[in-house]
């Protein structure tokens, strides 16, 4: 691994000329050219200005004038002179030589009369200004679109996944602004599903976006941000919308209610939302949170619950949610915001699952479970934030208080047997009742301070602290009586100090960074279980601290940026378990690690950009895998580990090449990744004849390796407003697993293909089709398994009576070729009919699962297990809703 890192460093150094050459050549400098284009007294909008290299007329930068004819061109160059070319339809082109210096240049264009035959000039729908892409919303909006989220799904380069994650060129965004303000602080789906498409003028994608202005020259930004530019009619006014719906399905009545109010002013923004329904929606737009505090999960105990079907709707119950966001702009660069969020969800359901555990001797242990459960979940959060973002300084402070309360009860019956049958008998486990109680209270704070001096030097300091308490209990009744009580408390602090240097004036800069982290965890456990005679009470305390110091070497030349970090980390761990006879329960150690990382960003041209990185890390055994006491994690799972401190090592590398052509409207990227991990301790499972699992640790050096390759392409055509997208994935993994105390070698090859097409059949009639095919081949102890599934969706949208009457018809089909018995193909039908008599009122009739499919079967593979599940689905339903804009 060290040899590979040295090779990457040599390649990075080789991209730069020698120091003597750099001193003899002119140093590149940044210039800004701005002005206004006019023809007489009228501004010229949509004109293209390009800066060219005099030697070969190659393009260095370009810009497009706005509605007032204004433009701004920025460039870093060492040339003394440049060529400026100006072109616009209907005007005589210009080409002039200018000095390569910051200046204001107002230009006048002369009209040019040309005879054009049957030429239709449309408003420009997509244009770029440096690292900002601008999408004209009206050019991408269809008659059936209601929210800005409907339009975002159609914009080239932007995708919204099933879990509502917004991505640009396959990478999740890091900010979602509304008029350049971050009102929602990570709950960005409130905007995509709550802001009307007709209120947005332009969607901007800020490529390579660094939110902190004082750090924009320090590190290559990998993510993009989205900014919504609203129309004037939507600014400074309250926008209110109400939706009320009622309907029915076989189990009983249905309801749907949503109320939202928003205000987007110049110095103040607010959004309020309340929603409630029993339609089986598992998505809450306020629940998907970008960039949240990374807190360690506190729930150690789980209720074995019914599964969720990948196709169809298997969620029964209801939910309520309320959210309030408010932001006040104190000055041009300072803002104060707060958020209050609450959600409650009650669910119930049932499923039948058959799990086959692959065993070392080539046999299988098959566990069949009939599960039904009912859960209640409550969550609330209060967030206060202050931010001051200036060119030379940045201050941010956030305080979050959150709580969760989960209650669950379930019934299950299970049968286990050995396959082939001759290898063993059948064990009837009988009926069991399970109950889960879980509470969590968290307090998180984050402070960040960046300061830059006049010469560009400065520092960045950040501190993140968290305090949490989580009591929880799991109770089993029926054929086996058991009870597990836990009380978990954690305090964590992460602090970073980094020195900053100005990187624009020189290619190489050297700075330093320091980290001080600490985490203290205490756990109290009480277990009563017939299979664990040494249950009773037990305690754990775990302290881990880490001090890291190291240099940061940065390289910057034009559009090429890279950084090499070499932190040397000193870690100290102190572990204290309740004594166990004949075993070691306490441990402590001091360990030194070198954890280098390399990142590279290179904008090869206006169309191509490259990002790459490599890293090595070493992490110590987490406290969860140091418990010497037995913990009942679920009705079928017991965990007991050893107090052995060891390191897990990982090395990874990834590269990503992105392409975009605005004029041809082509967006594409290809990404490759590699990761290898190794450790001296293996964690595996030991199964008894009833399918009960004991999670254990053993000294067994092992490793795992994984390769991934992803490709994506998107093309838009003017013909019938056609959109084409295609993506492919390939993954290969090898790892060593522990089952029944035996090391097993596991291999897997996964692949997937996904495509979509959308086009207008005629005015008001649009057809959209997407399909996804996935396959997996695995090999274990001469057992070869294969699974494959196809899912496709077809939707026809119709707009009649000047779009006042709209209809949507859709069909979903799934095929699982790996199901040996039973039904392999399922077809789901749905429809929606809406009538809008005026701008404020809309009536909507929704029909779900019109084919009335009540059950759905799947098969999937996961390392040493094979799952076959039968899900119970919601039957046919009809809901009539009224949507009113107030």
Where are these regions (language model features)?
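Membrane-proximal, glycine/serine-rich, low-complexity loop/turn segments characteristic
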Residues: 21-32, 68-70, 79, 89-103, ...
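Short, acidic Ser/Thr/Gly-rich low-complexity loop/linker segments typical of extracellular
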Residues: 55-70
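Conserved C-terminal beta-signal and adjacent last beta-strands/turns
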Residues: 752-773, 783-886
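Short, ordered, surface-exposed loop/turn motifs in non-cytosolic proteins
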Residues: 39-54, 79
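Face-selective signature of the C-terminal outer-membrane beta-barrel domain
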Residues: 331-345, 375-417, 425-578, 603, ...
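Flexible, surface-exposed loop regions and adjacent strand-edge segments
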Residues: 138, 219-221, 288-293, 353-362, ...
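Surface-exposed extracellular loop regions of Gram-negative outer-membrane beta-barrel proteins
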Residues: 572-577, 606-652, 674-691, 851-864, ...
């Amino acid at each position: 691994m060290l040899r590979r890192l040295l090779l990457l460093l040599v390649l990075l150094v080789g991209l730069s000329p020698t120091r003597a050459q750099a001193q003899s050549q002119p140093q590149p400098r940044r210039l800004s050219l701005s002005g206004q284009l006019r023809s007489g007294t009228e501004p010229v909008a949509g004109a293209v200005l390009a800066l060219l290299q005099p030697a070969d007329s190659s393009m260095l930068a370009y810009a497009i004038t706005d509605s007032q004819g204004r433009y701004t061109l920025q460039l870093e160059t060492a040339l003394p002179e440049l060529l400026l070319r100006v072109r616009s339809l209907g005007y005589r082109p210009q080409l002039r030589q200018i000095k390569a210096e910051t200046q204001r240049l107002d230009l006048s264009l002369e009209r040019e009369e040309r005879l054009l035959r049957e030429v239709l000039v449309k408003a420009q729908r997509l244009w770029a200004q440096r690292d900002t892409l601008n999408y004209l919303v009206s050019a991408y909006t269809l008659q059936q679109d209601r929210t800005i989220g409907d339009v975002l799904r159609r914009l080239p380069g932007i995708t919204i996944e099933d879990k509502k994650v917004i991505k640009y060129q396959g990478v999740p965004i890091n900010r979602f602004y509304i008029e350049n303000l971050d009102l929602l602080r990570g709950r960005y789906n409130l905007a995509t599903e709550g802001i009307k498409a007709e209120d947005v003028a332009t969607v901007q994608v800020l490529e390579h976006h660094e939110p902190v202005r004082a750090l924009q020259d320090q590190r290559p930004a990998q993510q993009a941000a989205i900014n919504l530019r609203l129309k004037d009619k939507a600014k400074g006014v309250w926008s209110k919308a109400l939706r009320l719906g009622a309907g029915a399905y076989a189990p009983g009545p249905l309801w749907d209610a949503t109320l939202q109010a928003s205000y987007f002013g110049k110095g103040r923004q607010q959004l309020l939302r309340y929603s409630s329904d029993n339609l089986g929606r598992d998505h809450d737009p306020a629940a998907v949170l970008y960039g949240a505090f990374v807190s360690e999960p506190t729930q150690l105990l789980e209720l074995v619950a019914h599964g969720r079907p990948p196709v169809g709707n298997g969620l029964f119950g209801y939910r309520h949610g309320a959210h309030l966001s408010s932001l006040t702009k104190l000055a041009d660069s300072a803002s104060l915001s707060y958020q209050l969020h609450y959600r409650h969800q009650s669910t119930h359901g049932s499923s039948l699952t058959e799990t086959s555990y692959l065993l070392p001797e080539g046999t299988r242990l098959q566990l069949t479970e009939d599960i039904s459960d009912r859960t209640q979940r409550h969550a609330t959060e209060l967030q206060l934030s202050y931010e001051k973002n200036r060119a030379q300084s940045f201050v941010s402070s956030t305080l979050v208080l959150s709580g969760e309360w989960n209650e669950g009860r379930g019934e299950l019956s299970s049968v286990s047997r050995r396959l082939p049958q001759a290898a063993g008998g059948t064990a009837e486990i009988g009926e069991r009742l399970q109950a889960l109680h879980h509470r969590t209270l968290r307090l998180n704070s984050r402070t960040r301070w960046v300061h830059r001096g006049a010469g560009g030097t400065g520092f960045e300091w950040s501190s993140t602290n968290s305090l949490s308490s989580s009591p929880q209990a799991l109770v089993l009744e029926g054929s086996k009586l058991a009870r597990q009580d836990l009380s978990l408390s954690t305090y964590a602090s992460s602090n970073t100090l980094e020195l900053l240097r100005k990187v624009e004036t020189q290619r190489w800069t050297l700075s330093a960074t320091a980290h001080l982290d600490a985490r203290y965890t205490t756990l109290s456990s009480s277990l009563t279980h017939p299979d664990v005679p040494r249950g009773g009470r037990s305690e754990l305390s775990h302290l881990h601290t880490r001090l890291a110091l190291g240099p940061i070497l940065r390289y910057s030349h034009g559009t090429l940026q890279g950084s090499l970090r070499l932190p040397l980390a000193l870690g100290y761990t102190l572990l204290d378990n309740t004594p166990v006879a004949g075993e070691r329960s306490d441990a402590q150690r001091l360990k030194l690690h070198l954890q280098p990382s390399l990142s590279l960003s290179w904008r090869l041209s206006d169309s191509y950009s490259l990002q790459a990185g490599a890293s090595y890390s070493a992490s110590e055994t987490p406290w969860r895998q140091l418990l010497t006491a037995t913990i009942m994690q679920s009705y079928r799972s017991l965990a007991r580990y050893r107090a052995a401190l060891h390191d897990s090592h990982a090395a990874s590398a990834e590269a990503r090449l992105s392409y975009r052509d605005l004029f041809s409207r082509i967006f594409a990227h290809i990404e490759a990744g590699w990761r290898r991990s190794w450790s001296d301790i293996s964690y595996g499972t030991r199964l008894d004849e009833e399918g009960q699992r004991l999670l254990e640790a053993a000294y067994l050096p092992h490793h795992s390796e994984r390769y991934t390759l992803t490709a994506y392409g998107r093309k838009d055509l003017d013909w019938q407003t056609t959109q084409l997208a295609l993506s492919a994935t390939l993954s290969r993994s090898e790892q060593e697993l522990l089952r029944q105390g035996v090391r097993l070698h596991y291999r897997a090859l996964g692949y997937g293909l996904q495509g979509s097409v959308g086009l207008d059949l005629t005015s008001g009639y649009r057809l959209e089709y997407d399909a996804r095919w996935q396959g997996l081949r695995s090999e274990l102890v001469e057992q070869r398994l294969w699974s494959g599934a196809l899912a496709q969706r077809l939707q026809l949208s119709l707009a009649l009576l000047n779009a006042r009457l709209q209809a949507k018809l859709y069909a979903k089909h799934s095929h699982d070729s790996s199901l040996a018995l039973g039904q392999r193909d399922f077809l789901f039908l749905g429809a929606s009919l809406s009538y809008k008599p005026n701008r404020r009122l809309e009536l909507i009739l929704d029909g779900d699962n019109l084919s009335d499919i009540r059950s759905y079967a799947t098969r999937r593979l996961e390392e040493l297990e094979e799952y076959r599940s039968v899900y119970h689905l919601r039957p046919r339903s009809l809901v009539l809703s009224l949507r009113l804009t107030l």
